[in-house]
Amino acid sequence: MIIVISILVYLLSSAISANSRESEIIKNVTQGYEFNIFNWERENFFDKWISYINPFDNHKKIKSSEQLIQYLSLVEKINLNENLYSKLFTEKLDLDYKIKKGKIDVNIAKIKTNEINAEIEQLVEKINKDKVIKNEKKIYAEQFLEENISSAIQSEQVNIFDNIFYVPVDLSLEKTPKLLVISPRDKIYRQEDKLLNSNISLEAINNMELTLLEENNLSAIVVPTGGVSTYPSIVSEGDLLYILQTAAHEWLHNYLALFPLGRSYFTSTDMQSINETICDIFGNEVGIIAYEKIMDRKIDNEINQTKKINKEFNFDKFMKETRLVVEKLLSEGKILESESFMDEQRVVLSSNGYDIRKINQAYFAFYGTYGGNPESSNNYYDNLIQIKKRYKNLGDMIHDIKYSDNIEKIYSLLE
């Protein structure tokens, strides 16, 4: 429990420090949309622990992969119905607009509106009913996932702990906060970022980004987050492998917060990238181990290929080349040309099945933090993989690298 409290103290002190460093520009533009980590921890920190010690909860627990898949299928069903609700609601607003502007026959519009209202009413009833079931099972799905991730972390392939030191895996499946990232326009640099509420509207996002561009000459983007290393970690709902890998990634952030590597996160963009990249490597490996244990089969490489994409199109190569061109244009002072080029590339991506809302300097600044991403321009992923090859397992590597608080110490492990 002392270890858990230590992590929580570090997270909250980091949040206080981040608030003190925050520029007035960011404070003004995000007012009313901020994600409050203090309130979130107060509401969520003790929930899981209470459930674990409740002797009357045992019959409710999820104890098999079949039960877990049923839960995840229910979550997917709710998400699909919520998307359909949004579509119907938009159609209804469009009809109201056409009626006001006299662009549609009133009687025809009323018939269509009544049909939409009936569909919405049925849909809301289904969503609310399913959410009741989901909320009853959520904590038990989380416990099942936590137990399997914990087992993977302690497996021979990872083996990160001794018999004394242990950080419990704790996660909460929910909509994750969004993140506002800003960069100068004349270079790609993660200058500042801030967590925002998950329910911020697209209109508010667009206004925020536009204000920072037009009034402050900053490149800005609001991006979704897969997870946030609060305690418990916030993990977005998705397919099983995605959840496991994201949860393991966020868990390692919590673990590293107890050591120099994690505490160096905010000292430089280099150490930020090192932390994110090593958590990606760890999360991907641990997630696969946990997945194969839960499903009792080897992973299918096509498991996450659900999007309708052009398989002939090489996304990684395209994005790497895009970043190189952008950096060249920026180095020549051609800011407007670089921004036009990025938007043109976004259109090309969309035509090949990759729908990205916006690509700008801030986009590359954020996604480039993760060394394994094609948007990155550093070699940290390759370097960390080379370091990993020198160790018997992932845990031994983490044990040594967690004491590195600067890039020079990381590079010394390559010598």
Question: In which residue ranges do the predicted regions lie?
Answer:
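N-terminal low-structure segments adjacent to metalloprotease catalytic domains
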Residues: M1-A152, Y391-E415
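Sequence-level detector for tyrosine residue identity
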Residues: Y10, Y33, Y52, Y71, ...
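Phenylalanine-focused residue identity feature
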Residues: F35-W40, F45-F46, F56, F89, ...
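Acidic/His-rich structured neighborhood in mature extracellular/periplasmic domains
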Residues: L93, Y97-I303
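Solvent-exposed, acidic/flexible segments
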Residues: L74, I78-N81, S236-Q245, Q272-E276, ...
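Pan-zinc metallopeptidase signature
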Residues: N310-E415
